[in-house]
Amino acid sequence: MVPLSLLRVGETGCVGEVLGHVDLVHRLREMGFYDGAKVKMIRKGSPCIIGLAGQRLGFRCDDLARVLVRIPAMAS
């Protein structure tokens, strides 16, 4: 698994794990970052824009580094 912040623009992945302080983990899970959720990097920068469940969400890259994803090339 790799941090979500390392995905390239247009690349997709599936959430595998969310790390960090319990409040951050809870907030991200409420937004849909649960195991198996499909995510897409739409824009890198400040903020990063992520596609998740038909929505576009903006995050600091530091927060996205705590979301670990599986990318298709890694799925085996």
Question: What does each model-found stretch correspond to?
Answer:
Residues 4, 10, 42, 46-76:
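C-terminal structural segments of small proteins and small subunits
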Residues 33-39:
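Conserved beta-strand/loop element in small beta-rich adapter and peptidoglycan-binding domains
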Residues 20-22, 36, 49:
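Helix-centric, low-specificity signal for extended rod-like, repetitive segments
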Residues 6-20:
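Short, basic/aromatic beta-hairpin or loop at an interaction surface
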Residues 23-27:
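Short alpha-helix capping/helix-loop boundary micro-motifs
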